[in-house]
From Swiss-Prot:
It comes from Oryza sativa subsp. japonica. InterPro entries: Cyt_P450, Cyt_P450_CS, Cyt_P450_E_grp-I, Cyt_P450_sf. Belongs to the cytochrome P450 family. GO terms for cellular component: membrane. This is Abscisic acid 8'-hydroxylase 3. Keywords: Heme, Iron, Membrane, Metal-binding, Monooxygenase, Oxidoreductase, Transmembrane, Transmembrane helix.
Length: 500
């Protein structure tokens, strides 16, 4: 009896001790989350954390995400907290804050993605890392994406543009899908040069499309789900890439394209060659980064030009002069000519600002960080809101107006970041701009198009594009290339469809 009593006392003691430890731990966490007890008595930014577990995720996805963030900024200011996608977050909507996170104190904020995304792309992909590995790999990737490489790539980009427009000619198609095809083809030629046969290209295209469909699906590995199919397709992609690398080694010709540079690079740990897995992860990462973002911007450019006929005619005149200098389009575009498209370049910059395809980026605080008297706790997600900055009237007058002339003067520092900022800014931004310039040249000098249905609604897949990908009919019209004077302000057919 006495022994039983002692056992009960001992068990009760340990239960009480465990409960006290739990209470102490949760109390500390509570104080930390609410900013109490911190050495400098800083507090969390204002904001709302929403419901337990789900936070404000439902509010985010029940409306336009940009409206959600804009309303939060209007209520709480340029730094505020929320809880979305299962994570406590601090949102930053000022140029100074974005620079703080992405440039001056970038070492305190690491790139962060869900594990399911890393598994889909590959854990060794450039944009999942920071530090020495990231810097070595970024320097390597910038070579095949630099000015010298792009100068040699102009004919290939032009061929891809011509092919895309020719396949669209006379048909009603989703602009976004057409632009995705273009961006994929440009990505393939950048990665593999002109050395990839059609069978391999078809294998890559087919399996990448499956990976893309499953990328934003719920990470359920049960057979038959989109995620499961995507993981299987990702393995097949790795197999195709491994075969290509093996064939190149057998020939003793790794090549000077992006794949060849990765195969020969000693960007691995301790100066070692990259493994085939590391090379494959980065190739798939480049394909992913190069396609949907660029295709989304190209889709918006087609819409913005359509919606502003006087601007379209001015762009058409600029491009017609270049076409005339190329013997009516019989000679290819040159790198120098793409550098001379002043108005067209401003249209691209304004499209990047207006659409703000990359609305924000994710980082994670690796330590408790203080910014302007507020605490950003270790482990919290930090999101610089690019779109909020791009649409702030303090930095861009009348921000909802599409006005390329605003770029006659350079924007204030850190107010225009369509490709990010700092060491993690997109290394392929100049390739993307080249693709846009060449597409616009051939689109406005050789074709007319009409938008089918409404183009005012926006959908996210995952980047913002007009609903249904902007359905449009395109047809060849060589007469437009000689209209260097005057303005056609657009016509309306009997069905009220604007034609340009």
């Amino acid at each position: 009896m006495a022994a039983s009593f002692v056992i009960v006392i001992v068990i009760s003691f340990f239960i009480s001790l465990a409960f006290m430890c739990y209470v102490h731990y949760t109390s500390r966490q509570r104080r930390k989350l609410h900013g109490y007890g911190h050495e400098k008595a800083v507090r969390l930014p204002p904001g709302s954390m929403g419901w337990p577990y789900i936070g404000e995720t439902l509010q985010l996805y029940s409306q336009d995400p940009n409206v959600f963030f804009a309303s939060k900024q209007k209520r709480y200011g340029e730094i505020f907290k929320t809880h979305i996608l299962g994570c406590p977050c601090v949102m930053l909507a000022s140029p100074e804050a974005a620079r703080f996170v992405l440039v001056t104190q970038a070492h305190l904020f690491k790139p962060t993605y869900p594990r399911s995304k890393e598994r889909m792309i590959g854990p060794s992909a450039l944009f999942f890392h920071q530090g020495d590995y990231h810097l070595r790999l970024r320097k390597l990737v910038q070579g095949p994406l630099g000015p010298d490489a792009l100068r040699a790539l102009v004919p290939d980009v032009e061929a891809a543009v011509r092919s895309t427009l020719a396949s669209w000619d006379g048909n009603v198609s989703s602009t976004f899908h057409a632009m995705k095809r273009l961006s994929f083809d440009v990505g393939i030629v950048t990665i593999f040069g002109g050395r990839l046969d059609e069978r391999r290209k078809a294998e890559l295209r087919q399996n990448y499309a499956i990976v893309e469909k499953g990328y934003n699906s719920f990470p359920n590995s049960f057979p038959g789900t989109l995620y499961y199919k995507a993981i299987q397709a990702r393995r097949r992609l790795h197999g195709v890439l491994s075969d290509i690398m093996r064939e190149r080694r057998a020939r003793g010709e790794p090549g000077s394209d992006l794949l060849g540079c990765l195969m020969q690079s000693r960007a691995g740990d301790d100066g070692a060659l990259l493994t085939d897995e590391q090379v494959a992860d980065n190739i798939i990462g480049v394909l992913f980064a190069a396609q949907d973002t660029t295709a989304s911007v190209l889709t918006w450019i087609v819409k913005y030009l359509h919606d502003h006929p006087k601007l379209l005619e001015a762009v058409r005149a600029e491009q017609a002069a270049i076409r005339a200098a190329n013997d009516g389009g019989r000679l290819p575009l040159t790198w120098a000519q793409t550098r001379s498209m002043a108005l067209t370049h401003k249209v691209i910059l304004e499209s990047l600002r207006m659409a703000s395809i990359i609305s924000f980026t994710f980082r994670e605080a690796v330590a408790d960080v203080e910014y302007k008297g507020f605490l950003i706790p270790k482990g919290w997600k930090v999101m610089p809101l690019f779109r909020n900055i791009h649409h702030n009237p303090d930095y861009f007058q009348d921000p909802q107006k599409f006005d390329p002339s605003r770029f006659k003067v350079s924007p204030r520092p850190n107010t225009f970041m369509p490709f990010g900022n700092g060491v993690h800014a997109c290394p392929g931004n100049e390739l993307a701009k080249l693709e846009m310039l060449v597409l616009i040249h051939h689109l406005v000098t050789g074709y007319r198009w009409e938008i089918v249905g409404s183009s005012d609604e926006v959908e996210y897949s995952p980047f913002p594009v007009p609903k249904h990908g902007l359905l449009a009919k395109l047809w060849r019209d060589d007469s437009v290339s000689v209209e260097t004077d005057g303005c056609q302000n657009g016509d309306n057919d009997d069905n009220g469809v604007a034609m340009v």
